[in-house]
Amino acid sequence: MATKNKKEIVNTETKNLANLIIKEISKESFDFGILQKMQQAFSTASKQKQREAFINILDTKLDKEQLHKLNQTIMKNANELMPDNDPNFVCRTSNNKVFQEILLLEAKRSGMQARFSDTGALQSLDIKDITPEILDHYRVLQEKFYLKRNSKDSVDSRIAQSINFLLYAPLFRESDIYKKLGLKSAEIEREIQDPNGKYVQQLIDAKIGSNIPFHMQKNNVNEGKEIERTAIIEKAITKFEQDKKFSFEGKKRDEITKYLSKSLEGASDYILTFKKNELVDVIYQGLDKGQTLWSKVANYIGIKSYSISKENLKSVAKIINDKIKSSHTPLKIEVQDKLKQISKELNRLNNPVLPSEAQKVQVKSNKKPPIAPKPEHLKKRDHGLC
């Protein structure tokens, strides 16, 4: 029923704007003009339900790359979009709330969430708790926004205020614990948004502004393998789409990719390189077998849609894991020979035994030179002294 109500409140203007973004996002022409249309469409508080419906459409239709590009465009144009009295990028005005909600959407999609202790107390964010996708946006904001706005606060403080206000407070609000805390929840939320509170101070102390590049570089260490894993899953999905003649919706595609990517984390470089076609086939067959009956019937009557249950998705992940475990990863002969050479050299360095010829030379050099006999006249003198 809730989904039905959301559909009922979407007006033509909202649908057209969402479709425009979905159509233009992959083009180079996606620019400031479309962002202005978004501001105008949701310029008053009375447009809240239309804004929520708009975000719901984007959530369904945009994949993670498209969503990231949309947010990147917002960040690059933040100086023109934000009013003069907002040096922190907190999107307080009605016409800018849509930008907060799009950023929050990506934060949730990328796995950012409120952190709680074992006793249920809300913990302050550390830089490592902020996903690479969100850090990337604040990297752009440093260059395109914060350096162009005057403020009594440091850049670290302004970034900390923005993240806590725009993202951490709403993430806390959407947690299960929030409801259980009752009136105390509102008090904690105010503290999250307090420029002088402990939640903001945690990120200031961590020097978030200057440390963003370091943490992004750290996150990029495993990015190569992540790209390889994603490419394998994407190849299987694309092949499936081509054969079935329909496209996965952006959100559904991301959910499947994210879930199956975890099942590929145990794959070695050898498997990702030399067994990738076999993995593509396994994923393809799993998607085909796991498709719900309703979805298959819908496809048969011309409705281009795909659905897979969580249980079936788990089954696909298990098949992938079994495939990885059964795949042998032998080393090539030349690699084995190279490793033997390296091992031999390391042993030589760790145990520096000199070759036999060098040893002979060293033994000879260590011998004391023979002492020449004393002349006769010195012998006599020595004898006299004794």
UniProtKB/Swiss-Prot annotation:
Residues 355-386 are annotated as: Disordered. InterPro entries: Uncharacterised_RP363/RP364. Residues 377-386 have a biased composition (Basic residues). This is Uncharacterized protein RP364. It comes from Rickettsia prowazekii (strain Madrid E).
